[in-house]
From Swiss-Prot:
Source species taxonomy: Eukaryota, Fungi, Dikarya, Ascomycota, Saccharomycotina
Cofactor annotation remark: Binds 1 zinc ion per subunit.
Cofactor annotation: Zn(2+)
Residues at the active site: 165
Key words, A-Z: Amino-acid biosynthesis, Cytoplasm, Lyase, Metal-binding, Methionine biosynthesis, Zinc
Entry similarity comment: Belongs to the aldolase class II family. MtnB subfamily.
Organism: Candida albicans (strain SC5314 / ATCC MYA-2876)
The protein's name in its UniProt record: Methylthioribulose-1-phosphate dehydratase
Positions with a binding annotation for substrate: 122
């Protein structure tokens, strides 16, 4: 369960009134505050307040791991103001065939104002996290801390930091030779070194897919991939784990920028 979001970007009573324009099935579906579509709205508002998804940038996707069909994936659309997004604006995709089951363009026009919604350009990257890491959610932000770190490490292929307490919030992952899957074996410890791969940006988001997949395969211990001069992708086994990992990593990235400016090494030598 999550704490209620207190940000006031959207009038809740107005949103409830608009639900009446939906089919009875969708009205019932969206009444659940923990429905993936509602959680995406909640997190988008929170992330907007953190300056992570401004100017329609960034995106969130959640796989319905607790629902009757864990292959259903809800994805926020492209080009919308994330702090004002509504649950009926999500694209619904079913894995593994990536079949689109529902789009916001199917919703009554009185709700969408005849706006032509487009699938998120992040979709193939989100899908990569689900298929390669069995993730329950994937978050993409345009965090300034993420961008700055990739600039400080302009000629590097990875970011590393150690001996910081916040590292404990992140999972310790290991490749299982028998199952062929990445498994969580615990949490990282204070002395551990966090390593996050950095991939180069491309003119179009979907063109990042191959590089992201390669980074995920080459860094089995990572829960995120930095995109140079762009932002970061973070995933977790549930939406709340992904949220925690994203917050912890952003804290570490912000701290890393300050440490760099102060001339303090990010990786402590034993």
């Amino acid at each position: 369960m999550s704490a209620p979001c207190h940000c006031k970007h959207v009038d809740d009573s107005s949103s409830n009134d608009k639900l009446s324009a939906l089919s009875p099935e969708l009205q019932q579906e969206f009444k659940d505050p923990n429905h993936p579509a509602n959680l995406i709205c909640e997190l988008c508002r929170l992330f907007y307040d953190n300056n992570w998804v401004t100017g329609t940038g960034g995106g969130i996707s959640i796989r319905d791991v607790d629902g009757p069909n864990p292959n259903l994936v809800y994805i926020a659309p492209s080009g919308v103001q994330k702090e004002r997004i509504q649950p009926w604006e999500m694209f619904l995709v079913e894995l593994p065939d990536e079949k689109i089951l529902r789009t916001p363009n199917d919703i009554p026009k009185e709700l969408t104002k005849s706006y032509k919604y487009k699938p998120s350009a992040c979709t193939p990257l989100f899908i990569s996290c689900y298929t390669l890491r069995d993730a329950g959610a994937c978050i993409h932000t345009h965090s300034q801390h993420a961008v700055m770190v990739t600039l400080f490490f302009e000629n590097e292929k990875e970011f590393a930091i150690s001996h910081i307490e916040q590292i404990k919030a992140l999972p310790k992952l290991k490749y299982n030779d028998e199952t062929g899957k990445i498994e969580k074996i615990g949490s990282m410890e204070y002395y551990d070194k966090l390593v996050i791969p950095i991939i180069e940006n491309t003119p179009h988001e979907e063109d990042l897919t191959d590089s992201l997949q390669e980074a995920i395969k080459n860094y089995p211990g990572a829960s995120a991939v930095l995109v140079r001069r762009h932002g970061i992708y973070v995933w977790g086994e549930t939406v709340w784990k992904a949220k925690v990992y994203n917050e912890a990593i952003d804290y570490l990235l912000e701290l890393a920028v300050k440490m760099k400016l102060a001339g303090i090494p990010l990786v402590k030598q034993e």
